[in-house]
Amino acid sequence: RLFRRQRQMCIRDSPYRCPPGPYERVSMTAHLLKAKNPTAKIIVADPKPKFSKMGLFQEGWGSHYSGMIDWIGSEFGGGSVSVDPDAMTVTIDGEVTKVDACNVIPAMKAGRICEIAGITEGNWAPVSGHTMQSRIDENIHVLGDASAQGDMPKSGYSANSQAKVAAMAVRGALTGSKVFPAKFSNTCWSLIDTNDGVKVGATYEATDEKIAKIDGFVSKTGEAADLRKATYEESIGWYSGITADMFG
């Protein structure tokens, strides 16, 4: 079924893990299909009116995979979706489509361990941005995807940044060492096609209410090919750096 005619992706509403992730997945699927079956179609059902790096992805889809990807946002029924796996059909806003493969991204929530600990409100675990301590049980620190912390996206970069704040807070509590004001950063890279990398990122600070965005940046549409290649290579360097940072 992988290389057949019709593929479908059903995306969830925010928040979810790695905001640009589904759209990079669409891009990589299109990259594969372009080589194996260039007549294939990818239909993307999305309950949101816009998404992370939307202009960049749509520009890339148009230039690399013209006519292959149809994105259906909330305005056109992207949030009204049902799936019949036995019949291999997807219904979008009442219209039934036969598909060869369907990737359904389910609703997300914090892991079971957070529920067992009793530190969730709704789907996520609220925390103080100053320390990443649970707002329900201060003896527990929560970071990364599971946390409801404010403006930071749920990403590996965010989790690593939050881990450093949590570690500093724990060290301060145990040893009495100085705890500096919490500062955070995040960058999310995405690959649209070979050597066509884009990114979005921001810096953040802790307030009493949440982790708040200070400023941000995003790749621009129409960038030169050498800049896009450099952005892709930057993402490879980041991965090498963050794995060394975590695991030595």
Language-model features: locations:
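C-terminal auxiliary extensions adjacent to catalytic cores
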Residues: 201-248
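A Rossmann-like FAD-binding core segment of flavoenzymes
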Residues: 34-123
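Cofactor-binding loop segments of dinucleotide-utilizing enzymes, especially the Rossmann-like FAD-
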Residues: 12-13, 47-49, 145
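Short FAD-binding loop at a beta-strand-to-alpha-helix junction that anchors the flavin cofactor
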Residues: 133-152
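A conserved FAD-binding loop/helix module that cradles the flavin
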Residues: 146-186, 190-192, 201
